[in-house]
From Swiss-Prot:
This is Mitochondrial inner membrane magnesium transporter MRS2. High-conductance magnesium-selective channel that mediates the influx of magnesium into the mitochondrial matrix. Essential for the splicing of mRNA group II introns in mitochondria by affecting mitochondrial magnesium concentrations, which are critical for group II intron splicing. It also suppresses a variety of mitochondrial intron mutations and its absence may disturb the assembly of mitochondrial membrane complexes. Homopentamer. Forms homooligomers. Interacts with MFM1. It is a multi-pass membrane protein. GO terms for molecular function: cardiolipin binding; magnesium ion transmembrane transporter activity. The keyword Transport applies. Keywords: Ion transport, Magnesium, Membrane, Mitochondrion, Mitochondrion inner membrane, Transit peptide, Transmembrane, Transmembrane helix, Transport. It is found in: Mitochondrion inner membrane. Belongs to the CorA metal ion transporter (MIT) (TC 1.A.35) family. GO terms for cellular component: mitochondrial inner membrane. PANTHER family: MAGNESIUM TRANSPORTER MRS2, MITOCHONDRIAL, RNA SPLICING PROTEIN MRS2, MITOCHONDRIAL. The chain crosses the membrane at residues 297-317, 328-348. A motif (YGMN) lies at residues 314-317. It comes from Yarrowia lipolytica (strain CLIB 122 / E 150) (Yeast).
Amino acid sequence: MDEEEHKDHQEEEDPHHFAFSDNYSEAVLGGEISATVFDVTGKVVHVAHKMTKYEFLLEHGLYPRDLRNIDPSPVSIIPSILARGRKGAGRCILVNLLHIKALILHDKVLIFDTHSKNKSDTHRLGMFLYELENKLKPTINPEKMHTDMTVLPFELRVLEAILVNVMTTLDGELQVHLKTLNEILVGLEDHVDREQLKELLIGNKNVSRFYQKAVLIRDVLEELLESDDDLQQLYLGTHPKEGLAEVELLIESYCKQADEIVQQASNVRSHIRSTEEIVNIIVDANRNALMLLELKVTIVTVGFAVGAFVAALYGMNLENFIEETNEGMVLVVGVACLGGLLVTWFNLTKLHKTQKIAMFSNAATHTASKPYMLQWIIGLLRRKRTKSRFDNIDMSRPKMKGKKSNILHQLTKMTGKRR
């Protein structure tokens, strides 16, 4: 019984015991990883320092699942900031943000080589290494560094340098997307071009990917702010007397920057959606205009066909009384033209009625769709009919005397309004 308790106690105290108890062999974790190592003063200790994954896990007390956050694979991994290891000198912070994959310890930091095929990411990583070296150099006397309350701990200074580089990268990408999309949107305001629509589609896809990337980074920072335990674990050394205010202000400031970038990207996407809707409306209107023109041409063609039909009947080699008269030619031409014009006028009138959108009652729609001359004739007939009925009223009764002129005046005003 004592041996089992001693064995359990040894597993808790030994951070390297997990590697043997989980049956992970060097053959399984034999791949190599390379990293650039900086010490607490910003001095480069190792450049492209290579080590096997197995040795790396044993040295830092990590689990194989933690390799996913720093594995230099081309597969995009969700951004993360995780505290790992046991209390004391074995504590570390795993950071995976965009092109930066780092392991932060209390006295050094490892920046892993991503070996990305994207040249821009490789260039950004090289610039970050140069910036990190300058930011970690002590600007005050190292002997007084631990007594100066304005200086952040080493792990927080490294984390801040990473966040500064990430926010700068996001802001730079956003400005590129804004410049490209604004040029396309301004061009679409003048005229709708097929090539510009294709460029707008590509730009919309790019800004959507950027928006998703920025949202993930903002969510990581918000999760840190919501958990006091996670914020406390970011201190790898001694905890300050003022509590978590220092690290909380640090994470909160960059969380706000990430949120601003997300909002700007969201506004751009909304602008693109509005432009797409307007373009669709314009395209639909042009399509409807072309269809209307086609219908008008078809109607005119039908009118000519009616006239041609009459001419074809007259041109048949059959005897009839028309050919013996002098007015036959004029009569046939007149009938053909009149028939074609009537058919064309009737079909165009029907097409005009179809274009009307009923906003009120059917009676109002039918009245509005009638030609002005026809409305005037109908109003005149109604007025005469009403006046004839009024003339037939028996005016011999005393009550009706003297009121005929007033009633007639009112009816005249009503019929005038009706017209």
